[in-house]
Regions:
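Catalytic domains of lipid- and phosphate-ester/thioester hydrolases
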Residues: 4-9, 24-449
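Bacterial N-terminal signal peptides
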Residues: 12-23
Length: 449
């Protein structure tokens, strides 16, 4: 064998070894198993410290999807709440942001939610230059185009969303995990993705990970954000290991009151349906892996978790079991909806739009309409509780009809739904500009401002 041939073979061998090494280094992290589901531990609402700015009021923020547009819009809402003072039911003056007990977020809104939960007030000094005014989309494209990343991207198990997760750690989250989030004193942060196989909402909380028999505390926040914003086709799914069935998890005891009823009360029926959808995640034998995509596919305004919690609260109140939410006198929900609906020129031409435009519009229209229905459903629940409480108060002890008594068994809390959206600016010169902003991970600085 000639020296030239030997030299060429060495180079080929070196390249092969380098490629294999790169693939090995790029193996996605695995969410570790737990041997026993412990209902009193981990990152969940029940373990969060009390937010005592006003114990009678529960303030919930729901941050919608929409790329950097959504991240900036939700950040602006936090700035407003930080600068707004209120007088609590105890007579104390405080910042409205300190009364927030829960923040939900999907897709672009998940970044603001997670970052605020991690950093608290420090976010207001750093978020703009670390994320909002950064060309995150451009940086992702550059990384994907770098040859050293190609072997990893071709490995089949380490996709574009894992590449994105690495970037999110570098610029925003600093490898923080949900254990770090649990140690914070802020509100409960609930971000969600969508299970690709079933279309079900997947929430990043220990209750969900109990079903998977896995420890959420060791999952990085960047992976949750990457999963919540993994736009199908554009970004790859984020894969979670399913250890379900190995830690003794069982559905909550309250479900036994309704599972075997042929005619459960309506809120209970919806809550049971949600619980059965969650139970499907617990079969780690036939579903050892879960592939997660953008949370906006199943819930683009971050409201499904809130609605489920209210319906469970109503169902438990019906059977006389109190809940933390049910003890509040007022529940205030800010729906921070960055949905935009820019006009299209299609109706001014006899030529129909192309295949790509049709595909994008077909995917977006059902999501937008479902988002509208979620907000209206919240208002319906608010109205039903108010009316039923009024009827019960007026009937008092004279209500003898058991059906009326049953129908009026709703929590005494008042629900206030506040829609924070671009639609409120219609007629304002800024509306057209904001409504035309793209759903991407880059925005001009003036749009953020």
């Amino acid at each position: 064998m000639s020296s030239c041939l030997r030299s060429a073979l060495r180079r080929v061998g070196l390249l092969c070894c380098l490629s294999l090494a790169l693939v090995a280094c790029a193996t996605p992290p695995i969410n570790p198993p737990i041997t026993q589901a412990a209902l009193g531990g981990g990152y969940r609402l029940e373990t969060r410290p009390a937010r005592n700015a006003d114990p009678d009021n529960l303030v919930i923020l729901a941050f919608s999807g929409g790329g950097t547009r959504a991240a900036a819009f939700s950040y602006g809402t936090l700035e407003f709440l930080r600068s707004t003072e209120f007088v609590s039911s105890t007579g104390n003056t405080g910042r409205l942001i300190d009364a927030v007990g829960v923040i939900t977020g999907v897709s672009g809104g998940s970044f603001t939610a997670l970052a605020y939960g991690l950093y608290g007030d420090r976010l207001f000094d750093e978020y703009e230059h670390r994320f909002l005014k950064r060309d995150v989309q451009g940086e992702l494209i550059k990384r994907a185009a770098t040859p050293t990343h190609w072997p990893s991207l071709l490995s089949g198990t380490w996709g574009r969303s894992e590449l994105a997760s690495e970037l999110y750690d570098e610029i925003l989250f600093g490898n923080a995990t949900f254990a770090d989030l649990q140690r914070s004193q802020g509100p409960m942060i609930q971000v969600s993705a969508t299970d690709l196989s079933t279309g079900a909402r997947f929430g990043f909380n220990q209750g969900m990970f109990d079903i998977l028999c896995s420890d959420l505390g060791q999952v990085r926040l960047s992976r949750a954000a990457a999963a919540s914003s993994a736009v199908p086709v554009v970004l790859s799914p984020v894969t979670m290991r399913n250890h379900g069935g190995s830690c003794g998890w069982a559905p909550p005891a309250w479900t036994d009151r309704f599972l075997h009823s042929s005619n459960p009360p309506r809120p209970a029926a919806r809550a049971i349906r949600s619980m059965r959808a969650l139970q499907a995640f617990g079969d780690g034998t036939t579903r050892p892996y879960l592939h997660l995509v953008d949370g906006g596919v199943s819930d683009n305004v971050g409201m499904r978790g809130v609605l489920d919690a209210l319906e469970v609260t109503e169902a438990l109140h019906f059977v006389g079991e109190p809940t933390n939410i049910g003890r509040s006198k007022r529940i205030v929900v800010f729906v921070v909806n960055s949905l935009s609906s820019p006009p299209t020129p299609w109706d001014r031409s006899d030529t129909p739009p192309g295949a790509v435009d049709i595909m994008l519009k077909s995917a977006g229209v059902p999501i937008d309409h479902f988002s509208y229905e979620s907000i209206e459903l919240l208002r319906d629940i608010s109205m039903r509780w108010r009316v039923m409480n009024d009827i019960r108060a007026k009937a008092g002890a004279n209500a003898a009809d058991p059906d009326i008594v049953a129908a009026t068994q709703v929590p005494p809390a008042e629900i206030y739904a506040i829609d924070v959206s671009f639609a409120a600016l219609k007629g304002d010169p800024e509306f057209d500009y904001l409504n035309s902003l793209p759903t991407s991970f880059t925005l001009p600085d003036e749009a953020v401002d």
